[in-house]
C-alpha cells in the first residue's frame, strides 16, 4: 500500500529512493489519488497510468484485465489532476496489460494509447 511504502521510505531515508505511483494499484489498495497531494513532486519518480475493466472491482481486479486509460472504471481524470497539482513532470507510462491487442499493428496500438491520454489532458 502507499502507506506501507511511505513507512519504508521513512525508515530507510529518502536518499536514493523514490516512489512509483500507479493508478491501477492505488485502486486495488482502495487509495484515493488525493493521498499523493501531501507528497509533492520530489518523492514521486515515475508514474503509471492504466485503467481497469468496467466489470471489475478493486477486489476482483487482476493484472491481465486492464484497458486503455479512460475506457474503464477508474477515476483517471482525478489521478491526472492530482499529478498536475503536485507538479509531477516526469514520465507517465501507460501500462495496459491485456491479452487483447490494442490495435492491429504496433503503430495503431501506440496511436490508440496516445489518443486515450490526450482525452485525459496528458
Give the role of each language-model region:
Residues 2-21, 25-122:
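Histidine-acidic metal/acid-base catalytic patches
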